[in-house]
Regions:
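Tryptophan-paired
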Residues: 56-102
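Boundary at the C-terminal end of the N-terminal hydrophobic targeting segment
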Residues: 38-40
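Beta-strand secondary-structure signal
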Residues: 44, 92-94, 146
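Structural motif
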Residues: 43-51
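N-terminal secretory signal peptides that target proteins for export/translocation
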Residues: 1-16
């Protein structure tokens, strides 16, 4: 087998079509690779407690909304789920709870009374953080992530595209859960 060396005079310059097609092919290839690796969508929350969810985040990304007792909300962007679920996948959820409908607002005219009321309301705020497993979504479309806030500072998450309450939705927990007398430690 002989090796031939091309001489400069034997080389042909790239055509204009080739010069344009190479970057397009690279761009389309990267786009296909990225579309296979991630899916991004909203961060939602369902509150099953009598507390207000003042704010929450999933892996540092804000859920945006304040969620009242026994309500849903959110709409922050974006939870990015890998295309393929892997055993041991988790998310970290940080949230703050507080009094939903504070009683006894004294108004602003009597500043000492107002400040005492404000301090009382602030004393009920609690910061929470929990790492939870992302359920297996193999073979399913991923539509962001929904965090369910449960009594005893517990949470569940799902990536389901179905609406809460529909028969196909994976979390069947009733919206209005009774608060237990005490929570497990």
């Amino acid at each position: 087998m002989s090796m031939q060396t091309l001489q400069a005079s034997e080389m042909r310059p790239l055509s204009k079509t080739s010069i344009v097609n190479v970057p397009i092919a690279v761009f389309l290839g990267l786009g296909a690779l990225l579309s296979q690796s991630v899916q991004a969508s909203t961060i939602e929350g369902i509150n099953h407690t009598h507390w207000a969810i003042n704010h929450f985040s999933v892996d540092g990304r804000s859920g945006i909304d304040i969620i009242g007792p026994y309500q849903g909300g959110g709409g922050g962007c974006c939870y990015i789920a890998p295309q393929r679920w892997q055993r041991g996948m988790t998310v970290r959820v940080d949230w703050e709870t507080g009094v939903a409908y504070p009683d006894g607002f004294p108004g602003f005219a009597d500043r000492p009374k107002y400040l005492a009321w404000r301090d009382e309301m602030r004393s009920h705020k609690r910061q929470h953080s929990k790492v939870v497993t992302v359920p297996d979504y193999t073979g399913q479309k991923v539509c962001g992530i929904t965090v369910h806030f449960l009594p005893c500072d517990d949470i569940q998450v799902t990536t389901s595209c179905y609406a809460y309450g529909s028969p196909e939705y994976p979390i069947k927990t009733p919206l209005q859960l009774p608060e237990p007398q005490s929570c497990p430690k």
